[in-house]
Amino acid sequence: MPHSDELDSRDVLSVSGLNIAFHHEGQQVDAVRNVSLRLKRGETLAIVGESGSGKSVTALALMRLIEQSGANVRCGEMLLRRRNRQVIELSEQSDAQMRRVRGADIAMIFQEPMTSLNPVFTVGEQIAESIRLHQRASHEEALAEAKRMLDQVRIPESQAILSRYPHQLSGGMRQRVMIAMALSCRPAVLIADEPTTALDVTIQAQILQLIKVLQQEMSMGVIFITHDMGVVADIADRVLVMYQGEAVETGSVEQIFHAPTHPYTQTLLAAVPQLGAMRGHSLPRRFPLISADEPALYESQIEQDTVVEGEPILQVRGLVTRFPLRSGLFNRVTREVHAVENISFDLWPGETLSLVGESGSGKSTTGRALLRLVESRQGEIIFNGQRIDTLSAGKLQPLRRDIQCIFQDPYASLDPRQTVGYSIMEPLRIHGLGQGDAAAKRVAWLLERVGLRPEHAWRYPHEFSGGQRQRICIARALALNPKVIIADEAVSALDVSVRGQIINLLLDLQREMGIAYLFISHDMAVVERISHRVAVMYLGQIVEMGPRRAVFENPQHPYTRKLMAAVPVADPSRHRPRRVLLSDDIPSNIHKRGEETPAVSLQLVGPGHYVARPLQDNALSRL
């Protein structure tokens, strides 16, 4: 049925009176109430709000995917203008018709790429499949286009990446693959649900620039769902603010940032972490929080040095981790990924050492090597005076109580067949630390400490938002009262208020229990807030390391300065300068087998502040 008269000539999407409800334990739970929005060609509409506010549910409803979760969707209208200019009512389309519409006319980039990519197919096959389906291209043409899209999202060694599987890529690279797949068919509307959450600041800036360039070329409408107000200021034309399932304020990006009218919008903006806010402070400080009852900011700024002098609890010496790449007729190892190259550092009790760097720089691999989830090629890992890199699995088991981890992808970390209460209780049972009522009380306490309710223990992972799932993973990591927690992008999926709550919780636990954190993150504003010391990684090596104040207030290495410059600012009047993205600007840590990476030499430039000699590298020479 044509609906062209009901849609303005410049609009590509119009939604009015959207209501979404779920049935839980015999009761109806309203997730979205009476939300309306319009999107014009070439326009970017940002939908912002806290975790659980209904942002992602709204996006899934537009894709007609939410019904598969048992949702009840009621809507006045949901009109889409396809690439061929035909206007259709999305709610009237059959499943077969929607399969033709998805990808070709309306595409979506999901928040968690590992759950969106098929683990049994290569990256190239998955991108090519979408191109073959919607553009009727041959297999060879589709693979060539897939490589071109990987080049556009700046994945190094794109030809080699085509034949790799999702689990062989870092979280940031998987997200770039998702973006390439969504843009491959040049849809009329692109829905981006936290598309840069897993990306470091430099790649994030480049991806945002890429989306804007492609948007201008194709007159594509973009719905950008995010909790990062700096990204909103950088990319959005208009903003829709959601709170508890309702649209509480909408307007141009200038109106929302410079003259917000709703109290929730005002407090949301005030809670945004700003790079440079820690200038003059040497110790970590708590984030200001949003009170749910009264939208005002409050914080405790009592600075306390939690670092315990004496012997480090964790020592890393000359750590090297490499991964083989096979090719050829006989599937021999011909090249290697030099993920971590000769890095050394110490971690003291009660200290937070942050590892920062681009996706693929070796941050996460370092954390996994310390946990013995991947085996290192050489080097020493010493925990509490005991070398652990040579221990057998049986002897390593008791030590796992003292070293816990929080991974980047919460959905992949939780068993979808078990309640979250069982997942949190499982470590207690494995290590014989609690049974029955005692374990249940511990689970209830942990859920409350991370901002959830005790009754949530009976729910399953799919019933929570991405941010809530990450809080569950943090609760599980805290269950055993560890001495060291390796937090791999632990707060990257959380909105600003929940992120602040979790960081404050980590700081409180550090103060109470003396926990040491190895904090792996690409969020420089969060790193500045939580860290005692910072180590900057580039292509598997540490190029700058020192006290947080020294590194942030006086960065010495050009790569560190590049990371600082790429941080988005929550002010639409202060745009980053754009630069041309060059193909040879893509760093790569893939080398021929037997080829050694030149080791960087760290020089002391201040108290505890070490900087590598400038790298002779094409990418860094232009910084």
From Swiss-Prot:
Its main location: membrane. It is a peripheral membrane protein. Gene3D superfamilies: P-loop containing nucleotide triphosphate hydrolases. Pfam families: ABC_tran, oligo_HPY. It is found in: Cell inner membrane. It catalyses: glutathione(out) + ATP + H2O = glutathione(in) + ADP + phosphate + H(+). It is an enzyme of class 7 (translocase). Its EC number is 7.4.2.10. The keyword Repeat applies. ATP binds at residues 49-56, 357-364. SUPFAM superfamilies: P-loop containing nucleoside triphosphate hydrolases. NCBIfam families: PRK10261.1 (NF007613), PRK10419.1 (NF007739), PRK11308.1 (NF008453). Belongs to the ABC transporter superfamily. Glutathione importer (TC 3.A.1.5.11) family. This is Glutathione import ATP-binding protein GsiA. It comes from Salmonella choleraesuis (strain SC-B67). The gene is gsiA.
